[in-house]
Amino acid sequence: MAETSLLEAGASAASTAAALENLQVEASCSVCLEYLKEPVIIECGHNFCKACITRWWEDLERDFPCPVCRKTSRYRSLRPNRQLGSMVEIAKQLQTVKRKIRDESLCSQHHEPLSLFCYEDQEAVCLICAISHTHRPHTVVPMDDATQEYKEKLQKCLEPLEQKLQEITCCKASEEKKPGELKRLVESRRQQILKEFEELHRRLDEEQQTLLSRLEEEEQDILQRLRENAAHLGDRRRDLAHLAAEVEGKCLQSGFEMLKDVKSTLEKCEKVKTMEVTSVSIELEKNFSNFPRQYFALRKILKQLIADVTLDPETAHPNLVLSEDRKSVKFVETRLRDLPDTPQRFTFYPCVLATEGFTSGRHYWEVEVGDKTHWAVGVCRDSVSRKGELTPLPETGYWRVRLWNGDKYAATTTPFTPLHIKVKPKRVGIFLDYEAGTLSFYNVTDRSHIYTFTDTFTEKLWPLFYPGIRAGRKNAAPLTIRPPTDWE
């Protein structure tokens, strides 16, 4: 079979060479035996170089014979053959290509055409190489067959390359649009910041006016008490001056006169010893004296963001137990009985929601996770499925950050976004900005940012708590809602 293929390859190469040789003959002049230059055609139909046929007929005045067929013509008729001239140029180019291919396609060992391909050595070989000891046990096929096979393989490679090229082209086009989109996003965020700080300034101005008014009231109150005390002290001073003059006068009187009413004078002097001299304190209230350090107004604004979150037992999965104050939740292996299967209750996903949801505004709460090895916290929208099997993702109405296997943190996006947290959080802070469409998570332990979801919220959002189903020693502890302590 291999020998037949080799013979077919040889025949194909010979046929191609013969066709090229015939073309070269047709493009040659029969007089000079070179490629035709300015080819012209005479009456008999043969073609010659214009210069060659002119020299051939140089001494003739009539009966001009053809150098090939000897047929004569009465007139010197030379018609340019431009089409043949173009073919001559093509033949020259083919001759050059043939020479180059011949030089490149010859076996360096046998100087024969490399018309075959060896699969094992992945190289072109000549006919002699193919039947030699080196390549005889190998699979050798005609070059055309190998070319076709590898052409098909390359074409198969071309499709994914074109797909990747299209992907890169689309990505590049998308990236080129992003500066404009970024500019719009930055401008939107800038306006949001300006608006928020304008509101902050307004509230601070209100607090400033309130505190300044209270300060002025306190000042007027102290001034009034100072005036009253000054008047009182003035009266006492006059009384004491009169008493001192009375005592001095008594001392200058004679015995009878001095002893007259002396008891009354001495009683007045005794009362002076117990007389209390009071001064009015000008010390301001503590809040005012410490105001530059405490930033009461700003603290008051921040406190307005803190949500008073409690757990709703009507939504709790039957394997969850809530504390009496409804601030803690833990997983138990034994399912609680006699719980009504209300529409609000989760029966597949062991989680619990808060009693209050949010449809606007900014809200902040903190969850103590301690040393638990498995948990998830976040929010879900009001319309989520609570009965059947579900995958809690943003697409299904859940925005969560979770921990599993003790050290694997992720934002439950599609696919999950791994979170590389340096310090294990003992407490997680959650900040919802409904209008801005952001839900941010913070590591309260080291005061670092964990992750922020960005979405468009259109329904009521409920704080969600999942204590984990692995009730091992460390994970048996509950999730607990804690009031933020940094505001005090």
From Swiss-Prot:
<feature type="domain" description="B30.2/SPRY">
    <location>
        <begin position="289"/>
        <end position="484"/>
    </location>
</feature>
<dbReference type="InterPro" id="IPR050143">
    <property type="entry name" value="TRIM/RBCC"/>
</dbReference>
<feature type="coiled-coil region">
    <location>
        <begin position="181"/>
        <end position="250"/>
    </location>
</feature>
<dbReference type="InterPro" id="IPR043136">
    <property type="entry name" value="B30.2/SPRY_sf"/>
</dbReference>
<keyword id="KW-0053">Apoptosis</keyword>
<dbReference type="Pfam" id="PF00622">
    <property type="entry name" value="SPRY"/>
</dbReference>
<keyword id="KW-0863">Zinc-finger</keyword>
<dbReference type="InterPro" id="IPR013083">
    <property type="entry name" value="Znf_RING/FYVE/PHD"/>
</dbReference>
<feature type="region of interest" description="Interaction with CDKN1A">
    <location>
        <begin position="359"/>
        <end position="488"/>
    </location>
</feature>
<keyword id="KW-0539">Nucleus</keyword>
<keyword id="KW-0175">Coiled coil</keyword>
<keyword id="KW-0833">Ubl conjugation pathway</keyword>
<feature type="binding site">
    <location>
        <position position="110"/>
    </location>
    <ligand>
        <name>Zn(2+)</name>
    </ligand>
</feature>
<dbReference type="InterPro" id="IPR003877">
    <property type="entry name" value="SPRY_dom"/>
</dbReference>
<dbReference type="InterPro" id="IPR001870">
    <property type="entry name" value="B30.2/SPRY"/>
</dbReference>
<keyword id="KW-0862">Zinc</keyword>
<dbReference type="Pfam" id="PF15227">
    <property type="entry name" value="zf-C3HC4_4"/>
</dbReference>
<dbReference type="InterPro" id="IPR006574">
    <property type="entry name" value="PRY"/>
</dbReference>
<comment type="similarity">
    <text>Belongs to the TRIM/RBCC family.</text>
</comment>
<dbReference type="GO" id="GO:0005634">
    <property type="term" value="C:nucleus"/>
</dbReference>
<feature type="binding site">
    <location>
        <position position="135"/>
    </location>
    <ligand>
        <name>Zn(2+)</name>
    </ligand>
</feature>
<dbReference type="InterPro" id="IPR000315">
    <property type="entry name" value="Znf_B-box"/>
</dbReference>
<feature type="zinc finger region" description="B box-type">
    <location>
        <begin position="102"/>
        <end position="143"/>
    </location>
</feature>
<dbReference type="Pfam" id="PF00643">
    <property type="entry name" value="zf-B_box"/>
</dbReference>
<dbReference type="InterPro" id="IPR035033">
    <property type="entry name" value="PRY/SPRY_TRIM39"/>
</dbReference>
<dbReference type="Pfam" id="PF13765">
    <property type="entry name" value="PRY"/>
</dbReference>
<feature type="binding site">
    <location>
        <position position="107"/>
    </location>
    <ligand>
        <name>Zn(2+)</name>
    </ligand>
</feature>
<keyword id="KW-0963">Cytoplasm</keyword>
<dbReference type="InterPro" id="IPR013320">
    <property type="entry name" value="ConA-like_dom_sf"/>
</dbReference>
<comment type="pathway">
    <text>Protein modification; protein ubiquitination.</text>
</comment>
<protein>
    <recommendedName>
        <fullName>E3 ubiquitin-protein ligase TRIM39</fullName>
        <ecNumber>2.3.2.27</ecNumber>
    </recommendedName>
</protein>
<dbReference type="GO" id="GO:0043124">
    <property type="term" value="P:negative regulation of canonical NF-kappaB signal transduction"/>
</dbReference>
<dbReference type="GO" id="GO:0032435">
    <property type="term" value="P:negative regulation of proteasomal ubiquitin-dependent protein catabolic process"/>
</dbReference>
<dbReference type="GO" id="GO:0016567">
    <property type="term" value="P:protein ubiquitination"/>
</dbReference>
<feature type="binding site">
    <location>
        <position position="129"/>
    </location>
    <ligand>
        <name>Zn(2+)</name>
    </ligand>
</feature>
<dbReference type="GO" id="GO:0050821">
    <property type="term" value="P:protein stabilization"/>
</dbReference>
<comment type="subunit">
    <text>Interacts with MOAP1. Interacts with CDKN1A.</text>
</comment>
<keyword id="KW-0479">Metal-binding</keyword>
<dbReference type="GO" id="GO:0008270">
    <property type="term" value="F:zinc ion binding"/>
</dbReference>
<dbReference type="GO" id="GO:1902806">
    <property type="term" value="P:regulation of cell cycle G1/S phase transition"/>
</dbReference>
<dbReference type="GO" id="GO:0005739">
    <property type="term" value="C:mitochondrion"/>
</dbReference>
<dbReference type="InterPro" id="IPR003879">
    <property type="entry name" value="Butyrophylin_SPRY"/>
</dbReference>
